[in-house]
């Protein structure tokens, strides 16, 4: 859509300008000691402004559930997305989708969830056209698509957002991760998802972001970043999830690598997840996060 193209250009220009958009997951829905308070966010409480990026999760939409994986009613989430978009915030979405082969209500964690990696045939069966799991997963994608198409502004125009399907695929804990799929199977799953949502369901409001897990210092950081790369035509945005703790070297080396890859691929990039819960070091963001970003532009 024109709005999606404008948002993509905005990400590119922000990155080139040397500025960065700060985000917070579920920022408008809940925080420390509060939940469902209109107009509130922890970031606003601390800084006076809402975060520039608002991230949320589609998890559980595959079951037509009332609430998402974090307990936010989907109707409420739609309201929050509209509110954020009206304010000029950038929306980013992930999808902790349950395991379509093992899911059943009431199973003990992690059985049937995104983190159920007990079967390494799930991806293989999903991408096999006409298989029972392929049929099941298309139904799940239909439900996701119906919700995405309901994300419109006050004029009824589709709200653009960054979509991070199959995130952290470099690790082994999800059913689509390194333990449960081959390189070819993962790439096929990515393409199947994109083409089904775009071509079959007519969704054109998403910027597709890949986001490998990047927590350490790696011998070949670029190789890790492009692990199971689906192809330049199937990735719009280069992300990374970096929970480096207090390992400044890990964060700095990964930020440098993603900024270089961004130039090479001519695509915007960003740190799609990072931080420490309950951080008690006041200068964490300025001394450990911002310092690494000063000479390595990301959006």
Residue ranges and their predicted role:
Residues 16-27, 95, 267-299:
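Substrate-binding cleft of secreted/luminal carbohydrate-active enzymes
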């Amino acid at each position: 859509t024109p709005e999606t193209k404008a948002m993509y250009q905005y990400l590119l220009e922000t990155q080139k300008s040397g500025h960065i958009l700060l985000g917070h997951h579920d920022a408008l829905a809940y925080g420390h000691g509060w939940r469902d308070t209109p107009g509130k966010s922890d970031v606003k409480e601390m800084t006076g402004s809402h975060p520039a990026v608002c991230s949320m999760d589609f998890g559980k939409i595959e079951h037509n559930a009332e609430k998402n994986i974090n307990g936010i009613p989907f109707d409420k989430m739609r309201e929050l997305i509209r509110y954020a978009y009206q304010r000029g915030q950038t929306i980013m979405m992930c999808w902790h989708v349950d395991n379509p082969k093992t899911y059943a209500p009431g199973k003990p964690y992690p059985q049937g969830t995104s983190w159920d990696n007990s079967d390494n045939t799930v991806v293989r069966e999903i991408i096999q056209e006409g298989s029972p799991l392929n049929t099941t997963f298309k139904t799940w994608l239909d439900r996701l698509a119906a919700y995405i198409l309901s994300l419109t502004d006050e004029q009824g125009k589709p709200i653009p957002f960054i979509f991070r399907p199959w995130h952290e695929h470099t690790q082994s804990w999800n059913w689509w991760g390194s333990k449960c799929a081959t390189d070819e199977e993962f790439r096929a799953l990515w393409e199947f998802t994109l083409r089904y949502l775009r071509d079959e369901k007519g969704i054109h409001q998403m910027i597709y972001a890949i986001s490998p897990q990047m927590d350490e210092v790696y011998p070949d950081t670029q190789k890790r970043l492009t692990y199971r790369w689906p192809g330049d035509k199937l990735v719009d945005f280069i992300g990374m999830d970096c929970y480096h703790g207090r390992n400044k070297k890990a964060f700095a080396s990964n930020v440098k690598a993603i900024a270089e890859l961004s130039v090479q691929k001519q695509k915007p990039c960003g740190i799609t997840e990072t931080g420490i819960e309950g951080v008690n070091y006041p200068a964490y963001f300025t001394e450990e996060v911002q310092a690494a970003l000063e000479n390595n532009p990301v959006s």
